[in-house]
């Protein structure tokens, strides 16, 4: 039955027949495909493996492709990998090749100056409007993962809308005080999105909370608190930095025991050993934007993280009495409404009863 399920997934893969030597990336213009995959393709070619970078719809799509053909390779966000893996067989289906060479960061955007931390977002989730990129995007998947992690906060969001891309999500978030956009990307101070946020009066909210940072998969942390630069320094003005949660970029393939042919299985094992033995520098660009960005990105110390987590928790605690009072008022209102409905029901019942006829008076 499992082989049949994988075959069904293969039929659903966009672009027709898939190849066993695919390195599934993401959008053709995205960082996975243009920045990271070429280095991996080069290293595999040197080891006599003929793998080619292949565009895809992102992490979830890559996982479906590897589930269908264990010899393929996929890039993805660790949080999405953790979210989707159980439904596809987990450790029986996937082998992680690389786990934490580089990280993507989660950004929350709003124009509301009263929202300054994740706790503010969490306690107001039922009243906020959340705008996300498409449902199949890594950003939307990250938000679903955060909802699973924060059952008393963002899980209670009642208004979640998906739009065409992160740029549109940001535009909508900057149009109203009750709106927040979430998106995931590699921190890049040259990216026009960060400039737009600043120019239009918006700000980035640190996506940091104990419920987020405690998440793990197979003993590995899913999110790390990092400080990263989002705007470059200007004359007489330093660059803008933000602290937020970042999730590792994971590289994965299928488990060798799912490869039925003996020679193909051994080749697959050799490929796995080759990639796992590579040094980090061999898989990252040595020059250009990303090498500069990651030199300006640092993981926070435990003490610094605790201070930020406390800010989020304080926001939740301050809101708790108001939330409880709102529940009480809501309960009282419901009880009064129920009593009013019962009275109206009784009044209607009496109105429907026939009026008794009086006996005629004697003449």
List each model region and its residues.
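Sec-dependent N-terminal signal peptides
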Residues: 4-14
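Segments of small-molecule ligand-sensing domains
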Residues: 233-313, 361-363
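Pocket-flanking alpha-helical
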Residues: 37, 54-92, 167-173, 179, ...
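Bilobed "Venus flytrap"/periplasmic-binding protein-like clamshell domains
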Residues: 21-47, 52, 104-170, 175, ...
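A structural signal for short loop-to-beta-strand junctions that line the ligand-binding cleft
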Residues: 90-104, 231-242
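Pocket-lining segment of extracytoplasmic ligand-binding domains
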Residues: 78-81, 113-114, 139-142, 147-247, ...
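Amphipathic alpha-helical membrane/lipid-surface binding segments
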Residues: 290-293, 297-359
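Sec/Tat signal peptide C-region and signal peptidase I cleavage site
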Residues: 15-20
